[in-house]
Amino acid sequence: MSITKVHARTVYDSRGNPTVEVEITTENGLFRAIVPSGASTGIHEAVELRDGNKSEWMGKGVTKAVSNVNSIIGPALIKSELCVTNQKGIDELMISLDGTSNKSRLGANAILGVSLCVARAAAAQKGITLYKYIAELADARQDPFVIPVPFFNVLNGGAHAGGSLAMQEFKIAPVGAQSFAEAMRMGSEVYHHLKILAKEQYGPSAGNVGDEGGVAPDIDTAEDALDMIVEAINICGYEGRVKVGIDSAPSVFYKDGKYDLNFKEPNSDPSHWLSPAQLAEYYHSLLKKYPIISLEDPYAEDDWSSWSAFLKTVNVQIIADDLTCTNKTRIARAIEEKCANTLLLKLNQIGTLTESIEAANQAFDAGWGVMISHRSGETEDPFIADLVVGLRCGQIKSGALSRSERLAKYNELLRIEEELGDDCIYAGHRFHDGNKL
C-alpha cells in the first residue's frame, strides 16, 4: 500500500524549541511522528536542519526542514508509489534525494520524521504492533520479547542543568527487579527519596529538575551526586538491586587535550585540568567506591586512544555515544580499536530507521550491547519504546520519572509488558546481553 499524502508542520519539543512533526496518509489512515533534538550533540551526528534566522525562534526554527518534507520528500514518495512496507527502499530514496553524507541538504529531522511515520503505517498495514514490525525489519527473535532495564537519569549536571557539576547524567538502574513494572516502582521510590535528600541538603530549589527530569542541585562533584543517590537507594532498601550509571558527556569540557571538570567556572584554572590518564584514575576511584555498572562517554568524541586504553582496565559497561553517533563508519572504527563495549543508539543521530537498525545489528555482531536513548529535547512520541523491544536491546534511557515527555516512553513499555504477558522477559542483570536472552 503506497502513500497518498505527506504533510509536515512545526510543533514544539520539551524545551519549547521548534521541531518537526510529520504525518503520512495511506488507505489505512493517518500516521504521525515527532522528531526529538539534543543539547549536547556530537559533531559527527547527522545534521539537524535549523533555519538560523535569529529574528525568529532565536535561530532554531525548522521551517526549512518542514518545507523540505512538504515540497521535496512528500511528492517524491507519492510519485514513487513505494509500498509503506518497503522501509529500506523509502529510506534509501530519501537519502538519495538528500545526496549528502550527513543529510545536511534536507535535514535529518525532516527525513527521520517520514521514516518513523512509514514504520507506523507499515505495522498497521500488516495488522501487527510497531515493536513486532521493527523486530521483523531487524530479523530479531520474538520468542520471547525482552523488556529493557530503564536507566533513569535522576540527577542532572553538565549541559543539561545549571550548577557546577561537570558530568551530565547520574542514572539508577533497577537490575534486581523482576519486571518492568517493579522496576518503575523501585525507580519512582528512589527518585522521590533523592528529591527529599536534595532539598534537605541544598535547599528547596534543589528539587527543581533539569531537561531530562532529574534533580539539579548546585553541587560540585560526582562524589556529592553519587553519595546522595546511594543514600536514597539504601533508604528504600534496594542496595544491590538498584545500580548506578554515569554519562560524563566530556566533549563539552575537553580542552587542549585535557578535561576541565570546572568548565562552568568562567576563570577555570588550566593547572587543574586532568590528563586522560588522570581522568582514568578518577573514574577508577568512583568505580571502587560506588555500585557503578555503566559509564557512558568517559572521554571526548575524538579522543580515540584514551577510549581504547581505558576499556582495557575496566569490567563495566562502557557506552559510546558521541564517539560513534549511531554512524556505521565510526562504529566500525570503535569496534576495531576496542574503544567501548556498548552502543548508544539515537534515531536522530543517523536519521532513518533503516540505518538505526543496521547500526544496532552491527554492534550486536561485534558482541556489543545496545542501549536505546531519548534526547534532551524530547516530545510525547513514544517510538523508542517500541524500538527497544523490537531490537531486543535490554536497556533504555529516557530520563527520570518526571516530565510527561519522559514518562511517555516508560508508560508505553508498561503497556507492552502487560500486553505480552508470558511472551516477554525482563532483562534484569542481563541488560547488556538482551539480544542473547
From Swiss-Prot:
Molecular function (GO) terms for this protein are:
magnesium ion binding; phosphopyruvate hydratase activity
The reply to whether Transmembrane figures as a keyword in the UniProt entry is no
GO CC, sorted alphabetically, is: phosphopyruvate hydratase complex
| Magnesium in keyword set | yes
**Cofactor needs:** Mg(2+)
Query: What pathway does this protein act in?
Result: Carbohydrate degradation; glycolysis; pyruvate from D-glyceraldehyde 3-phosphate: step 4/5
Which residues of the sequence carry a binding annotation for Mg(2+)?
247, 296, 321
Q: Cite the InterPro entries for this sequence.
A: Enolase, Enolase-like_C_sf, Enolase-like_N, Enolase_C, Enolase_CS, Enolase_N
- Which BP terms in the Gene Ontology apply to this protein? glycolytic process
The record lists the catalysed reaction(s) as: (2R)-2-phosphoglycerate = phosphoenolpyruvate + H2O
Query: SMART domains of this UniProt entry?
Result: Enolase_C (SM01192), Enolase_N (SM01193)
Q: Which Gene3D superfamilies match?
A: Enolase-like C-terminal domain, Enolase-like, N-terminal domain
Name the UniProt record assigns to this protein: Enolase-related protein 1
In its UniProt entry, the species of origin is given as Saccharomyces cerevisiae (strain ATCC 204508 / S288c) (Baker's yeast)
Identify the coding gene: ERR1
